[in-house]
Amino acid sequence: MVFVNPLANALTSIYNNEMRRNKQAIIMPASKLVINVLRVMQKEGYVGEFEYIDDGRWGKITVQLLGRVNKCGPITPRYPLSYRQMIALPDYIRRYLPSKEIGIIIVSTSKGVMSHKEAARMRLGGVALGYVY
């Protein structure tokens, strides 16, 4: 089995399990980036608790789903965002979110992975990784 983009696999797995009304999703392979993205989603209230399981190969993450994700997915190619672009809400953010009050763009910054709203508050730029609403 080939895993080209672990973040895309994780977000697709969460979305598919939410659409099937499952209470739990198993994500593999696990990575630090996926764990940090899950922390942002947990902080924003989209997923519940998650746990890393070391299986001796890639590792797995079990995520408790709350039924609050309508759509999530990766943003490819990964667009660089400046601080001013996060405030101005450019076209590609409008493309991924239904409105500027609903949903988040997950951004990787120099201070770590966070939502685009938090990055704009901290006046940071970064790279857009994915979206959730």
UniProtKB/Swiss-Prot annotation:
Q: Which GO molecular-function terms appear in the entry?
A: rRNA binding; structural constituent of ribosome
Keywords, A to Z, come to:
Ribonucleoprotein, Ribosomal protein, RNA-binding, rRNA-binding
Q: Name one GO biological process term.
A: translation
- Top-level taxon of origin: Archaea
Gene3D superfamilies (UniProt xref) = 3.30.1370.30, 3.30.1490.10
Task: Identify one Gene Ontology CC term for this UniProt entry.
Answer: ribonucleoprotein complex
Transmembrane regions: none
Q: Which residues form the signal peptide?
A: none
Q: Name one Pfam family in it.
A: Ribosomal_S8
InterPro entries in the record? Ribosomal_uS8 (IPR000630), Ribosomal_uS8_CS (IPR047863), Ribosomal_uS8_sf (IPR035987)
Protein family (similarity comment): Belongs to the universal ribosomal protein uS8 family.
> What is said about its interaction partners and assembly?
Part of the 30S ribosomal subunit.
Primary role: One of the primary rRNA binding proteins, it binds directly to 16S rRNA central domain where it helps coordinate assembly of the platform of the 30S subunit.
Its protein name is: Small ribosomal subunit protein uS8
